[in-house]
Regions:
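Extracellular low-complexity, Gly/Ser/Thr-rich intrinsically disordered linkers
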Residues: 265-325, 329
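N-terminal module-boundary/linker segments of secreted carbohydrate-active enzymes
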Residues: 31-74
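Thiolate-centered catalytic microenvironments shared by cysteine-dependent enzyme domains
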Residues: 35-39, 112-207, 293, 297-321
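Active-site neighborhoods of enzymes that stabilize oxyanions during catalysis
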Residues: 37-49, 102, 166-243, 328-357
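Bacterial signal peptide processing site
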Residues: 25-27
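C-terminal motif of bacterial Sec signal peptides marking the signal peptidase cleavage site
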Residues: 19-23
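Helix-loop module immediately N-terminal to the HCX5R catalytic loop
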Residues: 102-129, 249-288
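Bacterial N-terminal signal peptides that target proteins for export
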Residues: 1-11
Length: 357
């Protein structure tokens, strides 16, 4: 009899614990589903973890089939330690090399791939122009690069989990280690690139600097890069900026966009206008062609402006890396507003300005 009573007590205890745990789970789910998330438009890029969670759970109208991707450089599992360690549930892998070349030659200076190649790569990931995409990753500029490439090619609704996986976990959401794979799509749904106006070539940049007073070539580089003290990169020997460029600030090195972020999250345009961009040599009425060294950092301010509905924006994709490959390209070294700025050509630059790793 005592054994039976002991068994009964243990059984009841187990039921109570299970109910308590179930109750906790229900409460969390209810709070997520009832919590108000931000309103978004198709062109909204940066979204909260709460919004992503709600979309994944079918709680956001129009986003029931959202696809989440973690961005790593190659998008291959063997190279993606962060993904293997733990990722947003349901997230698949995609790489920067799905949208840009990895060659680094004069013919392929880390620019976007040909639009047809981007299209083919996106289709392999099940992405068409109508796919609702959410991206995140460890490098905010690398994530922005993929988002920019998708928008350029024609994906109409691309979101970025602002703050990445850290923000996701800080919001109390779980991660998983399951490897999720996409089902390929066959029809992208639009001729590519859908938005060629968002991409500026070196030839176009040179021509517009000469002929279009409304065109501003905006450097998203560190102060040391802007002033020509360093190239910022171990594989670029020359330092300087294209003649006529203006400074958009925002980086402490070639590997960050710190000025465009606060508390690990990308800021909005109003914050930029009231802070970093309060005293710059361009306005929102100019055509703004952002550039950096090889294209990653420039994509962050592009997306910030894009989500505000601006269309007078682009990325000069080749950046300083491509510009300094051509000896006759005009260059400025130093602050162009000062008397100390040197105006020369690439061929006359010293070749000892590579960054020391």
């Amino acid at each position: 009899m005592k054994k039976w009573k002991k068994f009964l007590v243990l059984a009841l205890s187990g039921v109570m614990i299970a109910m308590a745990l179930t109750g906790c789970g229900s409460s969390s789910e209810k709070s997520d589903s009832d919590a108000k998330v931000e309103d978004v438009s198709t062109r909204t890029v940066y979204v909260s973890p709460q919004w992503v969670n709600a979309a994944q759970n079918g709680k956001v109208k129009g986003y029931k089939n959202v696809k989440v991707f973690e961005v790593t450089y190659t998008g291959k599992l063997k190279d993606s330690k962060s993904y293997k360690k733990g990722h947003v549930p349901g997230a698949m892998l995609i790489g920067d090399t799905d949208v840009e070349d990895a060659v680094g030659s004069q013919e392929e200076p880390y620019n976007l791939l040909k639009p047809e190649v981007i299209e083919a790569n996106l289709l392999k990931h099940g992405i068409t122009k109508d796919t609702k995409v959410v991206l995140y990753g460890e490098d905010p500029s690398g994530v922005a690069r993929v988002a920019y490439g998708m928008i350029y090619d024609g994906v109409e609704d691309v979101k970025v989990l602002n703050g990445g996986l850290d923000a996701w976990k800080d919001a109390g959401y779980d991660t998983e280690t399951d490897v999720n794979k996409a089902k390929a799509a066959t029809d992208f749904g639009v001729a590519v690139p859908a938005h060629p106006e968002y991409w500026t070539s070196m030839t176009d940049a040179k021509a517009k600097l000469q002929s279009d007073s409304n065109f501003k070539l905006v450097s998203i580089r560190s102060k040391a890069e802007w002033l020509g003290k360093t190239s910022g990169y171990s594989y670029i020997d020359r330092a300087g900026e294209p003649e006529g460029a203006v400074w958009g600030k925002g980086a402490d090195s070639a590997a960050d966009v710190n000025g465009y972020m606060k508390d690990g999250k990308v800021v909005d345009l109003k914050t930029l206008q009231n802070g970093l961009w309060k005293d710059v040599d361009f306005t929102m009425d100019n055509h703004l062609a952002f550039y950096c060294g090889t294209g990653w950092r420039a994509c962050v301010p592009f997306l910030i402006c894009y989500q505000e509905g601006m269309d007078n924006i682009s990325v000069y994709d080749g950046g300083w890396y491509e510009w300094q490959m051509y000896g006759d390209n005009p260059v400025q070294v130093g602050d162009p507003d000062s008397d100390n700025c040197q105006h020369t050509t690439v061929s006359q630059l010293p070749t000892d300005k590579a960054a020391k790793n």
